[in-house]
Amino acid sequence: MPGSSVDRVPEVAAALGVRPRETLVAPFGYVAIYDDPKVIADMQPDLDRVASFDRTALIATAPGLDGADIVIRVFAPSVGLPEDPVCGTAHRIIVPYWADRLGKKKIHSRQLSPRGGDLFCEDKGAVIVIGGDSRLVIDGTIRLPD
């Protein structure tokens, strides 16, 4: 589910406060591509503007730093999630993009949310394999009606 190019640069720039080099669109959200990972780390989005978009999320990404291939932040205030701490769905969109740009199938991604996290992804064509450390935060049983 990689994104396709779309000209939403002015709207995304207004929402994120920094003009992206390129914007992509996918069913889950818009993707803003930047050249500088520091821009992603320092980003202070206008969440009301982000919430007004016609997609669930706005994903900001750039080449990586400190050993990571890429960095990412994901904002989804329209569904009650100002910033997703670590978003697997967004990686289904950005990993094919970065795999192509970087010329490699295995991508180490660092999500720069306040909680943060590292994901180790592999582009296998129709499937994106995502792995990393996790922490159990809730345990229970869900019962669905017959």
Label the model's feature ranges.
Residues M1-D146:
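Active-site proximal loop and beta-alpha junction motif in alpha/beta enzyme cores
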